[in-house]
């Protein structure tokens, strides 16, 4: 059975794992760094250290290849990890670009501060002369999702501020360039006053992998137990899974 490692700064990558599990039966080992979330705004040195901590932990399970289910890590440490471990690492950013290929016109990229400041999506998507990209750092959404305090009023206020430019310019395509954001996709859609293409790269990722296994085995490791991990994991993963919290910090 193929062993696939999937990792993220916290709960967001579970939206990727969920889509993978729907169509690709394999043995999954997911690591969510709920202890050190959010990753947006961290230095590259910190992100390298965090990613090494995670991959070193997952290597104990003889992983065949990895999915970096975090845009922030994808734009900062992908090449570093490939060189260090000599293994296949699939960054969510590459799949996001492929998911955007069938669209053109105006794009709003919602991501963390690190992802937006890298201008990864703007530089790549605007290679198409028919495309214009607007970028908004929506980092506060990650905090609210991970806190899971059900403060819908504050959440709606932040969503409104982040999508204001989309409503003003009637942007046709909104890329969820952080794997946390699909958790509140329905809320984002409701705050828009028009129909837009909401692009979730995780859906495209699941269509891009193949698995010959007949069995699905999901193992989830979180670096810290929080109210959000207790409440959201059962809602995000509707397949049988084994949940483990690390007894010691990384």
Regions found by a protein language model. Give the residues of each.
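Non-catalytic structural scaffold of enzyme domains
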Residues: 1-250
